[in-house]
Amino acid sequence: MPRRGLILHTRTHWLLLGLALLCSLVLFMYLLECAPQTDGNASLPGVVGENYGKEYYQALLQEQEEHYQTRATSLKRQIAQLKQELQEMSEKMRSLQERRNVGANGIGYQSNKEQAPSDLLEFLHSQIDKAEVSIGAKLPSEYGVIPFESFTLMKVFQLEMGLTRHPEEKPVRKDKRDELVEVIEAGLEVINNPDEDDEQEDEEGPLGEKLIFNENDFVEGYYRTERDKGTQYELFFKKADLTEYRHVTLFRPFGPLMKVKSEMIDITRSIINIIVPLAERTEAFVQFMQNFRDVCIHQDKKIHLTVVYFGKEGLSKVKSILESVTSESNFHNYTLVSLNEEFNRGRGLNVGARAWDKGEVLMFFCDVDIYFSAEFLNSCRLNAEPGKKVFYPVVFSLYNPAIVYANQEVPPPVEQQLVHKKDSGFWRDFGFGMTCQYRSDFLTIGGFDMEVKGWGGEDVHLYRKYLHGDLIVIRTPVPGLFHLWHEKRCADELTPEQYRMCIQSKAMNEASHSHLGMLVFREEIETHLHKQAYRTNSEAVG
């Protein structure tokens, strides 16, 4: 063990000494670059025998001065980066020293696992070598290709869109926008201040000055990410009056995995208050309670149900259903709130949240058409934390079973329809109605906006409140949450925007693209089948 400490100390000493020498070398280069020329015989550039005016030489000197200033700024940035790397490496060596001390006590963290590379720069370069940047990789099929996405100064052209993104759009997310701006700036830095090993020659302008590229010279770029290696960028620049393009390849390598935290989460005592706003739709409520009985009463057993019912019609049927469940399963953990007013989902959830009078509780805002599993309830508990996180799962929405299972006499039972396939449903990434959040967070943020009437909109308002706040929003598809198909009616009383959203949702809910296409071309298909049958019969008779 003392021998390991001596080796580590020696490596630390030489590493720090090498970085210090590197800093000194960069500083010396900076002084050489920025020092004025002392050669008295040096003449200003120009063609011998030509008479240039004073303005020409002043412009030329100004260009040279700007070049030196740009180079000086670049060198200063490199010096700052080296200082930062020196500090990071010092901290890393200190961390290794601490780990060595911990290992000496018998509780080493990495044990016999693969050790993190001692030279971080070497590791990052190895990531480039592993990625498919310079040499192609043998792939098993066309599905193994990682496609690029292309971009310009203002637009991104993407393949993976979901249902809310567009084939062409401005980068809305700040991280993506900042990433592309940084990449273009880095590409310009490479072109305007090339290294000696770069395969490019300095081009001169009409007055002999060095060409300086800017962001307006950026033509297009491509990027793709290999999840375990990093992101590759291919950038192309071109001056309007030149025929040649400048091509820059950049790579942002991913570093080694780093532990952020490790904790134990106890969910055995976490009660979920499932809040369901409801108006009429008693048949759907019967189906909902069947799922509730199987999952919540028989399996989970740590659930409270709050039903907020609007209107009088159907209220007695809902009471009867709840009383039947109580008598059959000895379940009493439910609350029925009756509101004699027009249905408003946001109002119902607000009332349901405030109806709970036993302090803090985790709430799941649910609809009567939702089918969930016991595993989802645990995901709900794991991904919501009071004062820190709210959970917005993406629901898998099922298509119209009459279309999906049109080749069967009767659609299969609901339990057999719960599959994640392209023709059976879609991820409802534009929906924010199903959410798990703690009561204190919901009340602190102000709940739902009561100004929103009718269908849709109130969920997005609440979602945006959390996005504008300090809580972490966990947004992810989950396998145990399904939206069952039901016929959707768009009321005439809706605003034009709400009506458009309702019709859009109705169209997306009906069937997949291929199934809708089969419906559109049904007559053409039937005509073809009739012709085939007629031809077959004619050949048989002949």
From Swiss-Prot:
Instruction: Please tell me in which tissues this protein is expressed.
Output: Ubiquitous.
Query: Which keywords does this chain's UniProt record carry?
Result: Coiled coil, Glycoprotein, Golgi apparatus, Membrane, Metal-binding, Signal-anchor, Transferase, Transmembrane, Transmembrane helix
| Residue intervals on the Cytoplasmic side | 1-11
Q: Where does a divalent metal cation bind?
A: D369, H486
Superkingdom to which the source organism belongs: Eukaryota
Query: What the protein does?
Result: Transfers 1,4-N-acetylgalactosamine (GalNAc) from UDP-GalNAc to the non-reducing end of glucuronic acid (GlcUA). Required for addition of the first GalNAc to the core tetrasaccharide linker and for elongation of chondroitin chains.
Q: In its UniProt entry, what is this protein called?
A: Chondroitin sulfate N-acetylgalactosaminyltransferase 2
Q: What is the lineage of its organism?
A: Eukaryota, Metazoa, Chordata, Craniata, Vertebrata
Q: Gene name on record?
A: CSGALNACT2
